[in-house]
């Protein structure tokens, strides 16, 4: 119920800041899906582009960024692009992937986004979803990681203690984006939210 209300409020906020020729990047996740589900059909804005902020993770296609991008674009009568790659690959593979023209073009557009919509997760839960091993998860805990957003793991002071390789949005990129919409709620995520938001 809390997440549903947050989704409605976030959709309402997005509706208020939309304008012509605007680029929206969004991550996957249950919270971001709530925004997309609650977004009304809007046709008055022209030249809106919707993009995934990163690749897709997990087995649940319904909450992957590419799926949510297509759904949001449909509601906004907008154009969209997809990023067809697994989110969690190593740096050498990322370098290779970024040389592919079609991916390079999408990534350049992602970095020029006007609005970034993202969820915030608990560090250990997100590490498991991203396929990190128990040893790596233990290392994250030792480093004080409490929250995760766009593949970055944050401690209580909002410092990035670890980040997964990506062709999409990274922590420093997020800071350059004009409007950030973080969607998260519930007591269990309080520490994660404070950690991530201290960075911004």
Task: Please give the residue ranges for each predicted region.
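N-terminal active-site beta-alpha-beta segment that forms phosphate/nucleotide-binding
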Residues: 1-90, 200
């Amino acid at each position: 119920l809390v997440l549903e209300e947050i989704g409605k409020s976030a959709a309402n906020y997005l509706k208020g800041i939309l304008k012509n020729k605007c680029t929206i990047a969004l991550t996957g996740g249950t919270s971001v899906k709530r925004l997309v589900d609650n977004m009304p059909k809007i046709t008055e804005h022209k030249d809106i582009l919707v993009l995934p902020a990163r690749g897709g993770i997990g087995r649940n296609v319904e909450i992957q960024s590419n799926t949510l991008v297509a759904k949001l674009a449909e509601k906004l009568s907008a154009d969209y692009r997809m990023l067809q790659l697994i989110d969690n690959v190593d740096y050498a593979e990322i370098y290779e992937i970024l040389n592919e023209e079609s991916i390079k073009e999408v990534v350049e557009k992602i970095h020029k986004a006007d609005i970034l919509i993202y969820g915030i997760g608990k560090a250990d839960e997100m590490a498991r979803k991203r396929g990190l091993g128990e040893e790596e998860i233990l290392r994250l805990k030792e480093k004080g990681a409490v929250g995760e957003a766009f593949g970055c793991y944050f401690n209580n002071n909002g410092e990035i203690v670890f980040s997964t390789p990506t062709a999409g949005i990274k922590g420093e990129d997020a800071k350059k984006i004009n409007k950030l919409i973080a969607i998260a709620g519930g007591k269990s995520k309080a520490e994660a939210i404070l950690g991530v938001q201290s960075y911004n």
